[in-house]
Amino acid sequence: MLCVSALLAGSAAPAIKNMAVIASAGSKLQDVPLAELAKLCKGAQKTWADGRNFTLVMKDPESPDMHVAVQKLFGMPGGEVKSAIAKLNEARTVVRVVESDEDLLRTVEATPGAVGVLDVYAINSAVKVLRVDGKLPFDVGYALKGN
């Protein structure tokens, strides 16, 4: 009986989602270094190597699902990132925060140069998953893996 209650208690903990960096299906992007993504997210680099404007599309940066991505891409805790995003967006919208997975997918598909951070199980055929430092979301050592 004790084992069953321990199992039930353990299953109540929120699962860490596997997040993916996505781009529109027609994008030429394939593999993006984490260091380049971080420079783009922090505003140190404004455009992709081909000159297209960079836009990051994400859901609430303070949500538990986004914790690892915010840490890796912005180098700060979720509680501080909203003010950093507001500052980045003063001249041009660099980071778009959307309400749902569907909004994120639509925005990435419709915005040239956009990438999004999304739960791998929400991906559809309108987008493709980018490698980050040569790795996909389920590969060992993937940069945005929560555990």
Predicted ranges, named:
Residues 1-9:
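Bacterial N-terminal signal peptides
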Residues 13-147:
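Exported/periplasmic ABC-transporter solute-binding proteins
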